[in-house]
Amino acid sequence: MSASVQSWTDRLDGKQAADVSALLERATAADGTAPVSEQGVHAVSGAGSDGVRHLVETDADRIVGYAQLQPGRGDHPAMAELAVDPAARGRGIGGRLVAEVLSEGGPDARVWAHGNLPAAQAVAQRLGLIGARELLQLRRPLADAELPELVVPEDISLRVYRGVEDDPEVLRVNAAAFAWHPEQGSWTERELAERRAEAWFDPSGLFMAFAASDDQRLLGFHWTKVHPKQGDEPAIGEVYVVAIGPDAQGRGLGRLLTLAGLHYLRDRGLGAVLLYVEGDNESALHTYDRLGFERFHTDVAYARA
């Protein structure tokens, strides 16, 4: 067996990007969960990848491991994601990738373990890492399940996305609502354009709330998403982004907008819906618990102790 070699690059070439994408697909099929986030997948192809660095581990010119390092911004640490080809596991590749990205990312760097699978836990224990952040995936059924009635208060106007004319307000509220969030809070027009170009994008699934007396200043929005059927897995809806402006908190808009999206997804014939929420976001967890969501799996960001 030949020794594998690691190398860093600021941008994957066309063949590397295709090989990494195929590796990620194999890892997803083997593990039942994607090893790299949506934002990370975009960065593989070079989209929205300012400052992102890529680490590939090759064996006889074949990519057997991949890691991606998102740079730190302000108070937010560098974040890494990685995957090992299922056919090359059990050779220490995952541990080497983790050690290298943490070294390159600086003392506060973190590495995601999506699904927190046993192999990832074993690597973390071996390297003396601790869980520094949790991202929970919650799910609830839609088919044959009751949903509360959608009642829009008289002082609120609810409508769907009309196009790029709405983007400035969407970005303003998103940045304010997720100022604490290292990935979501940094969205720009580029991120919106990338997602509008996706096959799943449907403007009628992006709900926007305004004061009835002011239809220019957005209070909050809920962007839904539909994941298509994959193999034996049926299509599933997602509460993709719920953002409420800080000046509109405490008015029940999170529940209202979430419920509007759930009715929309159910009306599209979807049997279930998922969402992601930070493990320490007690307010959001309370809202989703009341709407019938239950924990499905957990992503953990590991850091040095």
From Swiss-Prot:
Keyword NAD: no
Positions annotated to bind acetyl-CoA 1: 82-84
GO terms (BP aspect): mycothiol biosynthetic process
Limits of the N-acetyltransferase domain: 10-153, 156-305
Keyword Transport: no
UniProt EC number: 2.3.1.189
Residues the record lists as binding acetyl-CoA 2: 242-244, 249-255, 281-286
Pfam family, one: Acetyltransf_1
GO molecular function: mycothiol synthase activity; protein-N-terminal-alanine acetyltransferase activity
Residues the record lists as binding 1D-myo-inositol 2-(L-cysteinylamino)-2-deoxy-alpha-D-glucopyranoside: 38, 183, 225, 238, 276
Gene3D superfamilies named among the record's database cross-references: 3.40.630.30
The protein's enzyme class: transferase
Record keywords: Acyltransferase, Repeat, Transferase
Subunit and partners: Monomer.
Family under the similarity heading: Belongs to the acetyltransferase family. MshD subfamily.
NCBIfam families attached to this UniProt entry: mycothiol_MshD
Protein name per UniProt: Mycothiol acetyltransferase
